[in-house]
Amino acid sequence: YASEHPAVECLSLRFKRSVYADQLELDELDPYIVVYRRLEEYLSARGENDRLELIRRCLYFKINKKLSRPPRGRAKSWQRLLFERLTRDWGWDERQLATLDSRSQWKVRQVGNERRALVNELTFSYRFLSEFARNLQITSSLSSRDLGVLGRRLYAAFERKAGKVEFINPGIAPDLAEDRLTLAQLPAQNDREEWQWAIYQGHLSTAECGDFAPLKRSRELIELLAWCHRNGVIDPGTRLTIHPGDSDLNDFELNNLLESLRQSFPLPLPPASEMALLRASAPAEVLLLVNVGIDPLKQHSQKNIHLTSKRTDSLNYSGIRENLVLTLDQVCLNSWNELLVSRWQGSGALLDCLSDY
């Protein structure tokens, strides 16, 4: 409609013309098909085949008739017959239908590919509408308010920025949880003195990790675990293999970290309210984690020396007044439902954390 303004032909008018012209094929008068035909006409004229394929997949998912499987009843429904004809016209083969019909089993890689197409389309459409409103000099407070809320909702859900945990599954698949994962800290590919954390499908040895592409990698452990939690990749039933690398991480600490994330940020998150999106984002829930994957007394424990002292202040521990707070990881959920991860390290970690917060 916006692209045709001001000479807009409404779908209702096209529908009436078809009826008065005695074009009464019920399949073509179905509201979903009427909308699809209009979009197909528009995108085909512009040569935008990728966008058209996305529209076709959306329509196929909406109708929810799995054509790669036999019908449940004896007779095929009219929707199934219609989509058998449409998918033949689109050139979809059995393999593509089977992939789409297995959407409930899609995991991170397939969901990530579909998400990229959706994000590109939603972002393009929002920018187009914003430009359309500016060109027409729309001054309605309601229109500008709606566009503002929509823009912030898209920004909160899809905009990438430093420290923000990417949400990859906006309803594309019902469950991304993996049965078996391997968590490993390995030397970075471009700098052997740097270490990175990575999460892999299945049970892998340290040597095998180099032969497979990880689902996700990150410099810091908490950023990676927060991503796994936010996207439901790890759930209580997931079995984890750990290769701690240069860290002091063990199974007990890892399980406690995951449980802390579950308790602090239970899923699914409630949607951000319109009122929250009209205001600047603000912290709603904060989780602070101390010395993740680090033994602050490692130089003593390696020698089998265990310090005991009445001076238990972790910032001024024992007779040597040692600062045991070496790192702080902060996970913050804000009022726009953005999950943000920050890290501080060194003797001034606590002061830096308080100052930045």
Placement of each model-derived feature along the sequence:
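Nucleotidyltransferase catalytic cores
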Residues: Y1-Y357
